[in-house]
């Protein structure tokens, strides 16, 4: 056996020797990489051990004997061994299905500089410890799960951890690494690190040890935040790729001051305000944001450029791979000079500025409130005008303002000067305003605005409630009574909200404050109100608590105005955050023990809950550090608690109000119901009893003399909008009974669509009829007894006009569940004959329904509008969430692009019954996605890909009867689908869109479809034999050319009577043919 194996392997050795003799010079100079399979290297190792003994185990270079060998095999072995010793680049590949019989040894490679391992098990690799100190690049793919098994243990050598002195490039992409480890400390000279396509969730602190890093690729992982880097690598990193992760912010990139390429595409960035850290990246050249939710914003590029550094955008900047256009450049923020730039201004520049200022007799007015940005805003010297000399008023500056003359000081002296000016400025405020110097703006405006200021004197506290228990008190308006009546609190808020803009002081140039605010907006990404706001209480010194940790070291001032809770920086008085009071939902107070100034004591804690979407703004927690924290907290609570109660009252009013819609102009508005309008069932009750119908409501309103009219067009034809958003998924009917409202104009025919599963209906307060922007007019009824005006004694044939709507309600047994029927609005082209029925049982809410309602998950609108003429654009407009799902999970080829889609009920040949699906067409394929659940939430939860076919494989297209369906047949593999579109205009437009896609294919891939037939009702149609022969004969004798198919519907399940409705003809049969 061994002899046979050696004989079979001899051609391998001789062939490799001849190959290296011909092209070995490319391998020796490093321009080509020697690629070997693991079995080949194992055989070469055995040959070397057989003919050359143990000399291949030596660590250094081995010199071969100079005398000629006896056989050709020994000569070839000596040649190959000599070549491997001088090889600089090696690529070692292991076939996964081939089991390794022994270890893979790389001892012969003495001069190795570049090593690449593909699917090689690390524990089977031997000899890495002899070459690790000279390797310059290392690539491992599909073979490692941790870094330390290669970097620390050197594979199967299991050696001690030593530094890799020359290693500059590490590529560990396409592995199963879940976490980093301390082995990265051994890579002192690393410049390029690629860990893409792994399973890393958090880099923690391990990347901080890489001091020379210039390129970092962590794409296609599960990171939720930007990785932390060391101080040295922060200034050296040039490229950061974080594509396809789970980032919801880019906080941390502002420290990468020399970054040139940033890729955060396909993450979870929601708002453009989260891009504020980009303003400090002055050398950024490439920015990729595609695939994020903010990328789908219609003004994405202009909203992004607001946060990009103007210095970076002015030099060949690429946003999402495209250069900036002239319209994009208009949205760039103005370059605001910073304090550091003003300090670094050269002495010669400042001398020229002073000389020009003196020559033009235009001395600058340096006042107390002048910002540092203003001092450098006039860098360019003015040209002397030839016109009249303007007479200027002299401005007398404060003694502290004369310090601007010493501008030619060194950098350290400039910092001292800035600090000295700030101190003198504070002293002047103290002298002018006394103990209330921190509120100098409010004191200057006291003539215009009445200020609410509360103190803790004994006289004022007589009319207040008892002191607040700060241990576990929670200000929830549902449980706590109002502390201040609306009469006491409302004037203060109205006065504060109606304040006028204060006059600008003579010594305060308004331009400086605006430039400072623009700079703050650029840094924070938040819009600051230029109009000053009046404080409703004294500013409170607090420290913010993040999560459940200790308070932050930076203290801030907490200001409360009529509209905002403002966080102000303690040192520079810069606004950090503005939180709107109208979003304040709840206030909580508690206590915590904290050590301050070597004194451990109990401090009160204030927690504010807001209704923001952003997580970091939903809850703000502060520890009060003022001199009298309890008194300050009490003052804040007296101001904020009426606001919370007012917010809850507004929410209750919105719930009690009725959402109405005008039938004439479709304007939507809110209307508060009077007691005479609410009927016997108040809106507060959680029962499913409904309000009266629109006719009864208008009759009552007319009787009271107060008709409900549209505020836009003054029309009194209004309807009640549904309070709950119903699912767009069809729901199968139950047998409990139905209640309908059918008319000549609204009925379109019908078969019932059955969805994949029954959708639970949310509780409804009233019966509603809705004409909306979608494809249906809906009338909902819930279980209640009929009013006398709408009793069963009326005629069963129901008609409707444009002026009034009469709803027919069936009688309900006690405890019987009711249903509502939703009919599609008739197509404007008049071609739709089959309606889209939706049934949903109206019953009490279950726990799962309540949780679904509380989560407020967004529903999906996947149906094109039928209130206007359809066109191709209706099928191409897709929700960005669905498009992202198609790109990531459905499309099978990289160059596929979405073209159109259609939500339709489908019947597949070979499968029993119909099913709801979404038909998606790209530029190459057609995909059938089955709807498996409620259309709500993530697409992966309710979509399943069934089939996919190439557009070029379409072999037959056929339009169904009356253009209500479309049949498609495919080849390779053979399949047939019948799309039950049930709308003539929708069918025709979708067929036209599909035909256009087929024509856009290359000529060699064009479809084989030559013509598209349309099914007609004739004796060859399969419905023809189903007609009654007697009726056919009698009709022919009477000379009738057409027959009409009538539809009958059971009014009640247990009732024997049948109700006939006037319908349009469903089938027309021409007997003359």
From Swiss-Prot:
One of its GO terms (cellular component) is cytoplasm. Keywords: Cytoplasm, Leucine-rich repeat, Repeat. Its main location: cytoplasm. It is found in: Cytoplasm. Residues 779-788, 843-859 have a biased composition (Polar residues). Residues 389-409, 455-533, 724-817, 834-859 are annotated as: Disordered. Signal peptide: none annotated. Residues 515-532 have a biased composition (Acidic residues). LRR repeats lie at residues 166-187, 189-210, 212-233, 236-257, 258-279, 283-304. This is Serine/threonine-protein kinase 11-interacting protein.
């Amino acid at each position: 056996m061994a002899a046979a194996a050696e004989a079979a392997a001899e051609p391998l050795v001789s062939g490799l020797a001849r190959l290296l003799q011909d092209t070995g010079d490319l391998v020796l100079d490093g321009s080509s990489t020697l690629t070997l399979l693991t079995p080949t290297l194992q055989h070469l190792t055995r040959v070397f051990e057989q003919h050359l003994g143990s000399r291949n185990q030596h660590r250094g270079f081995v010199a071969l004997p100079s005398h000629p060998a006896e056989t050709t095999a020994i000569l070839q072995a000596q040649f190959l061994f000599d070549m491997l010793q001088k090889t600089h680049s090696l690529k070692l590949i292991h076939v996964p299905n081939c089991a390794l019989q022994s270890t893979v040894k790389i001892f012969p490679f003495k001069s190795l500089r570049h090593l690449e391992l593909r699917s090689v098990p690390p524990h089977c690799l031997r000899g890495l410890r002899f070459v690790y100190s000279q390797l310059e690049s290392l690539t491992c793919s599909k073979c490692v799960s941790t870094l330390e098994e290669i970097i620390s243990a050197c594979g199967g050598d299991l050696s001690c951890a030593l530094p890799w002195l020359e290693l500059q490039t590490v590529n560990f992409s396409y592995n199963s690494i879940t976490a980093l480890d301390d082995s990265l400390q051994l890579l002192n000279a690393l410049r390029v690190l690629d860990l893409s396509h792994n399973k890393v969730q958090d880099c923690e602190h391990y990347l901080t040890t890489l001091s020379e890093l210039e390129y970092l690729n962590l794409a296609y992982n599960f990171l939720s935040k930007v990785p932390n880097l060391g101080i040295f690598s922060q200034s050296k990193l040039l490229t950061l790729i974080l594509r396809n992760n789970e980032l919801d912010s880019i906080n941390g990139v502002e420290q990468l001051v020399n970054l040139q390429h940033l890729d955060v595409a396909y993450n979870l960035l929601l708002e453009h305000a989260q891009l504020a850290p980009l303003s400090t990246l002055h050398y950024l050249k490439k920015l990729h944001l595609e695939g994020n939710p903010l990328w789908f914003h219609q003004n994405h590029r202009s909203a992004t450029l607001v946060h990009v550094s103007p210095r970076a955008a002015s030099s060949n900047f690429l946003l999402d791979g495209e250069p900036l256009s002239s319209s994009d450049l208009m949205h760039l923020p103005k370059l605001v000079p910073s304090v550091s730039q003003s300090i670094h201004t050269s002495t010669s520049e400042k001398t020229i500025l002073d000389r020009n200022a003196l020559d033009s007799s235009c001395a600058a007015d340096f006042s107390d409130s002048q910002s540092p940005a203003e001092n450098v805003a006039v860098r360019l010297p003015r040209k002397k005008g030839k016109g009249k000399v303007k007479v200027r008023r002299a401005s007398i500056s404060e003694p502290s303002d004369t310090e601007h003359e010493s501008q030619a000081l060194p950098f350290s002296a400039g910092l001292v000067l800035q600090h000295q000016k700030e101190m003198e400025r504070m002293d002047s405020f103290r002298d002018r305003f006394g103990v209330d110097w921190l509120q100098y703006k409010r004191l200057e405006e006291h003539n215009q605005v009445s200020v609410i200021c509360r103190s803790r004197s004994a006289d004022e506290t007589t009319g207040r409630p008892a002191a607040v228990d700060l241990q576990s008190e929670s200000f929830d308006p549902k449980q706590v009574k109002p502390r201040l009546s609306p009469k006491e609190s409302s004037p203060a808020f109205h006065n504060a909200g109606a304040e006028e803009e204060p006059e600008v002081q003579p010594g305060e140039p308004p331009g400086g404050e605006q430039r400072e605010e623009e700079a703050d907006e650029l840094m924070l990404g938040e819009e600051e109100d230029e109009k000053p706001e009046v404080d409703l209480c004294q500013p409170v010194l607090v420290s913010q608590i993040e999560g459940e940790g200790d308070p932050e070291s930076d203290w801030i001032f907490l200001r409360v105005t009529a509209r905002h809770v403002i966080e102000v920086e303690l040192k520079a008085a810069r606004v950090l955050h503005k939180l709107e009071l109208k979003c304040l939902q709840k206030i909580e107070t508690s206590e915590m023990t904290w050590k301050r100034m070597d004194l451990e004591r109990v401090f009160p804690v204030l927690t504010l809950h807001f209704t923001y979407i952003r997580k970091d703004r939903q809850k703000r927690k502060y520890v009060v550090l003022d001199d009298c924290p309890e008194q300050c907290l009490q003052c804040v609570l007296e101001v904020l608690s009426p606001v919370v109660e007012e917010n809850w009252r507004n929410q209750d009013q919105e719930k009690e109000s009725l959402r109405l819609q005008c039938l004439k102009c479709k304007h939507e508005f809110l209307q508060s119901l009077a007691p005479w309008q609410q009927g016997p069932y108040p809106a507060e009750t959680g029962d499913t009893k409904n309000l009266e119908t629109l006719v009864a409501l208008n009759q009552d309103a007319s009787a009271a003399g107060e008709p409900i009219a549209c505020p836009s067009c003054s029309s009194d034809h209004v309807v009640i909008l549904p309070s709950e958003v119903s699912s767009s998924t069809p729901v199968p009917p139950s047998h409990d009974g139905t209640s309908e409202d059918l008319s000549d104009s609204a009925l379109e025919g019908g078969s019932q669509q059955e969805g994949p599963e029954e959708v639970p209906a949310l509780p409804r307060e009233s019966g509603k009829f809705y004409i909306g922007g979608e494809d249906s007019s809906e009338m909902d009824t819930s279980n209640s007894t009929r009013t006398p005006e709408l009793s069963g004694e009326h005629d069963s044939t129901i008609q409707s006009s444009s002026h009034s709507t009469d709803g027919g309600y069936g009688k309900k047994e006690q405890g019987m569940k009711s249903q509502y029927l939703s009919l599609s609005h008739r197509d404007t082209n008049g071609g739709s004959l089959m309606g889209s029925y939706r049934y949903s049982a109206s019953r009490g809410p279950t726990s799962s329904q309540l949780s679904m309602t509380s989560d407020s998950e967004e529903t999906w609108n996947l149906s094109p509008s039928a209130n206007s003429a359809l066109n191709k654009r209706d099928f191409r407009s897709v929700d960005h969430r669905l498009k992202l799902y198609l790109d990531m999970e459905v499309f099978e080829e990289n160059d596929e692009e979405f073209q159109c889609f259609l939500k339709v009920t489908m019947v597949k040949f070979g499968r029993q019954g119909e099913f709801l699906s979404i038909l998606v067409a790209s530029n190459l394929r057609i995909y059938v996605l089955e709807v498996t659940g409620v259309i709500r939430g993530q697409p992966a939860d309710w979509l399943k890909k069934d089939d996919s076919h190439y557009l070029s494989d379409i072999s037959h297209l056929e339009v169904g009867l009356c253009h209500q369906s479309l049949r498609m047949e495919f080849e390779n593999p053979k399949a047939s689908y019948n799309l039950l579109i049930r709308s003539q205009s929708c069918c025709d437009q979708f067929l036209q869109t599909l035909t256009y896609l087929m024509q856009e294919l290359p000529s060699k891939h064009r479809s084989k479809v030559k013509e598209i037939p349309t099914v007609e009702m004739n004796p060859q149609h399969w419905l023809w034999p189903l007609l009654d022969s007697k009726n056919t004969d009698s009709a022919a004798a009477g000379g009738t050319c057409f027959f009409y198919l009538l539809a009958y519907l059971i009014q009640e399940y247990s009732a024997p009577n049948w109700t006939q409705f006037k319908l349009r003809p469903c089938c027309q049969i021409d007997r003359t043919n």
